[in-house]
From Swiss-Prot:
Record-linked Pfam families: 7tm_1 (PF00001)
Chain ranges on the Extracellular side, renumbered to this chain: 1-32, 91-107, 173-194, 428-441
Region (Disordered): 255-316
Protein name: Muscarinic acetylcholine receptor M4
PROSITE patterns reported for this sequence: G_PROTEIN_RECEP_F1_1, G_PROTEIN_RECEP_F1_2
Keyword terms, alphabetized: Cell membrane, Disulfide bond, G-protein coupled receptor, Glycoprotein, Membrane, Phosphoprotein, Postsynaptic cell membrane, Receptor, Synapse, Transducer, Transmembrane, Transmembrane helix
Compartments, as annotated in UniProt: Cell membrane; Postsynaptic cell membrane
Membrane topology category: Multi-pass membrane protein
Compositional bias per record (Basic and acidic residues), positions renumbered to this chain: 260-270
Organism: Xenopus laevis (African clawed frog)
Any one GO BP annotation for this protein: G protein-coupled receptor signaling pathway, coupled to cyclic nucleotide second messenger
UniProt keyword Nuclease present: no
GO CC term (a single one): postsynaptic membrane
Gene3D superfamilies, per the entry: Rhodopsin 7-helix transmembrane proteins (1.20.1070.10)
């Protein structure tokens, strides 16, 4: 009888415990859980799709296969892992109110989460360092900036992140001899010490942010300096006379046939001989050829002295305007030699650089018609040279501006999304009850949202990425190679 009574009481007690466990209300109501699941699931989906688009764009579009974009590819890999695993597991943890998957999955999730997050920070740091070397050492660093070197740097970032976090997270309980994380909870055991938490926050976030901010300021200043060097003329310098022009002398003799001027031009800074300007440039195109860019240069041919010859300025297009032609003379003038002066000056109109070319014959003795055409041909070639130089300088400036803008957007997004959580970590070190649990969840999730924002940064700051995204989403695969 006593045994029956004890068994009945025991079974009733067990039944009440079971009912208590089952009937414990969750932290959120049903509609709240649906809302949380919808929002977090949508963010996870957008993160996965966006970073897959980034990786596919770099893979299929050769124009995006640059060293700098390989670092973005590595960053997209980290963001993709966060979107697939970290976001969804943390959402499950929030909705359930406890960790339902056991300690092994907990440790694996934490190891993956912290390794990938730290790899993202390391990739951002590498991007900043690599860009700083490009703008501060433009002559020496590009020679070492190879795909192999980029691969080694990316591998180092991932290996270092793995070594810093994975062993400590997975094996700390064996090092100290016990697992102190309660059942139903999931956090890193060695971070239960506030001092350790404070130190890791400084090393993993604040120190990299300070370094990247300093590097970006340095990159921005160096890029602006390089762009200004392409258009060094200031407003005060514009008022200076034409004496600031660069001059080249071309000697014209009767021994040089007309067709030679149109075949090959070899240019040299120091001087000229036999009407050929020496420089490592051959088979130049004439000024009549159509150009796809809007670079500007102008040329004029006149008998006027240099100080009286006006320079034609243009903000776009190429203008080649011989203002005056020289009449032919008797054949005895063929034996005469003439020195012509070609002047090249770069002017700045607003934010644009304009290159003007002026050819001025120094002597008053005119030449026959055959020799008369030679300055025009040379002017055309110099117009083409100047046009190409302006185009290359503008393209380089545009590329630098694009890369710098992309880096700025990525760093800004990183700082905005990661700062709230890391500020709360520091506050929690001194006051463990000051931060509400919901604010913790939001702050931690903001770190994940950074992986969602990064692909948008690439598209907004890089037109090629944007067009490639569009072609991929619309299945216009044949147009991907032409996206510019």
């Amino acid at each position: 009888m006593e045994n029956d009574t004890w068994e009945n009481e025991s079974s009733a007690s067990n039944h009440s415990i079971d009912e208590t466990i089952v009937e414990i209300p969750g932290k959120y109501q049903t509609m709240e859980m649906i809302f949380i699941a919808t929002v977090t699931g949508s963010l996870s989906l957008v993160t996965v799709v966006g970073n897959i688009l980034v990786m596919l764009s770099i893979k299929v579009n050769r124009q995006l296969q640059t060293v700098n974009n390989y670092f973005l590819f590595s960053l997209a890999c980290a963001d993709l892992i966060i979107g697939v695993f970290s976001m969804n597991l943390y959402s499950l943890y929030i909705i359930k109110g406890y960790w339902p998957l056991g300690p092994i999955v907990c440790d694996l999730w934490l190891a993956l989460d912290y390794v990938v997050s730290n790899a993202s920070v390391m990739n951002l740091l590498i991007i900043s360092l690599e860009r700083x070397f490009c703008v501060t050492k433009p002559l020496t660093y590009p020679a070492r900036r190879t795909t192999k070197m980029a691969g080694l740097m990316i591998a180092a970032a991932w290996l270092l992140s793995f070594e810093l976090w994975a062993p400590a997270i997975l094996f700390w309980q064996f090092i100290v001899g016990q697992r102190t994380v309660p059942s139903g909870e999931c956090y890193i055991q060695f971070l239960s010490n506030p001092a350790v938490t404070f130190g890791t926050a400084i090393a993993a976030f604040y120190l990299p942010v300070v370094i990247m901010t300093i590097l970006y300021i340095h990159i921005s200043l160096a890029s602006r300096s390089r762009v200004r060097r392409h258009c060094p003329e200031t407003r005060q310098e514009k008022k200076k006379p034409i004496s600031s022009m660069k001059s080249l002398l071309i000697k014209q003799t009767k021994n040089i046939p007309k067709q030679d001027a149109g075949d090959k031009v070899v240019e040299k800074k120091n001087g000229v001989s036999n009407g050929k300007i020496e420089k490592s440039m051959t088979n130049l195109q004439t000024a009549e050829e159509k150009e796809t860019s809007n670079e500007s240069s102008s040329a004029s041919l006149s008998h006027n002295p240099p100080e009286k010859q006006p320079l034609s300025e243009a903000s776009s297009g190429v203008v080649l305007a011989p203002t005056q032609s020289m009449p032919p003379l008797p054949a005895k003038a063929n034996t005469a030699s003439k020195w012509s002066k070609i002047k090249i000056v770069t002017k700045q109109t607003g934010n644009e650089c304009v290159t003007a070319i002026e050819i001025v014959p120094e002597c008053a003795i005119p030449l026959p018609e055959q020799a008369n055409n030679r300055p025009v041909n040379v002017a055309r070639k110099f117009a083409s040279i100047a046009r190409n130089q302006v185009r290359k300088k503008r393209q380089m400036a545009a590329r630098e501006k694009k890369v710098t803008r992309t880096i700025f957007a990525i760093l800004l997004a990183f700082i905005i999304t990661w700062t709230p959580y890391n500020v709360m970590v520091l506050i929690n070190t001194f006051c463990q009850t000051c931060i509400p649990e919901t604010i913790w969840y939001i702050g931690y999730w903001l770190c994940y949202v950074n992986s969602t924002i990064n692909p948008a940064c690439y598209a907004l700051c890089n037109a090629t990425f944007k067009k490639t995204f569009k072609h991929l989403l619309m299945c216009q695969y044949k147009s991907i190679g032409t996206a510019r």
